[in-house]
Amino acid sequence: MLKAYKYRIYPNSGQRIQIAKTFGCCRFVYNQTLAYRREIYGKEKKSVSKTDCNNYCNRELKKDYEWLKEIDKFALTNAIYNMDAAYQKFFKEHAGYPKFKSKHDNHKSYTTNFTNGNIAVDFETGKIKLPKLKAVKARLHREYSGQIKSATVSQVSSGKYYVSILVETEHKELAHTNHNIGIDLGIKDLCITSDGKVYENLKIIKKYEKQLVKLQRQLSHKGKRSKNYYKTKKKIALCHEKIRNIRKDYLHKVSHEIISENQVIVSENLQIKNMVKNHHLAKAISDVSWYELTRQLEYKAKWNGRKYIKIDTFYASSQLCSVCGYQNPDTKDLSVRTWICPKCGAEHDRDINAAKNILTEGLRQIA
């Protein structure tokens, strides 16, 4: 199994210069090979493979631009492979057509491959050995065992540097459990389960969102490209990063608990891209991070021998009585939070009842 371990690194001035060079050269090669691919297709209507692009880089670009030879060759090759992956996504998944990369992008990264011990993590000295950088000081808060496959060096908008070490390792599955659960994703709360547990949205994020609004207001009054403008911009980036990290950490804790305690997990397959088109709900939907939660549940279920099922978006989970199956049209009104079934008299909390119906439908599909 492949697992990634992310660590913050603290490069010295020379290493920062080399990292910046690598970012720039990878961006340059990405853009040049993308332009080459477009040109060949425009002239000859001929598809160009990633191998052709790599050969073009080695034979033409490195000959014309000598400074490319100062950069780790695997980083340049992976930049070409990333460009090819964007092309494949465009054709297979109907994603947007690949765009040229800008030096003003907030997130910069490059990936290098392991070969002949060129990447190594020393937990005793707290340093990571990387190609062209030698030993870089790092905060190694988690140990791992296994074979290193690659390393991705990145710099986020706040200016911090990170390295993600991809490792081939063994994963011990969680013990089997007989408990199953349905999950109703919400806006007021993150999610509600079929056994009545409510996972609330984090209130502390509101505190940082208020700080963010204040900083953005301050930024609007700063002179563009002034020192204070860039200082405030960095504070905004740090605030965004804080919110993102708090939210992701919470989602990991929630998903770990759900996966640990249940064998079958069922949720709705919500079309989030379509839902955020509703401008009244877009921010609320983005804030609760449904996509990230379901993504974590999906891969953690695979790791641990669990079954994660997504039922149809249009399944009437909120309208059905989970006891007798009666469909109550009155519950189409979202303001109806509790109701009594006219057929069997069962009392329902809207969200818990929906979660029970989601579980029933999921179990029916795998029966």
Predicted regions and their residues:
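Gly/serine-rich nucleotide phosphate-binding loop at the start of the catalytic core
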Residues: 1-76
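Well-ordered beta-strand positions in beta-sheet-rich domains
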Residues: 4-8, 150, 180
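Generic detection of short hydrophobic beta-strand segments and adjacent strand-loop junctions
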Residues: 7-9, 135-138, 199-201
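Non-catalytic, well-ordered alpha-helical scaffold segments
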Residues: 17-20, 24-27, 74-81, 252, ...
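Stable alpha-helical structural segments in soluble proteins, enriched in small hydrophobic residues
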Residues: 33, 79-90, 352-362, 366
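Long, hydrophobic, amphipathic alpha-helical segments used as structural scaffolds
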Residues: 34, 38-41, 87, 91-98, ...
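Acidic carboxylate diad motif detector
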Residues: 52-156
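Positively charged, helix-rich recognition surfaces that bind polyanionic ligands
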Residues: 142-147, 157-367
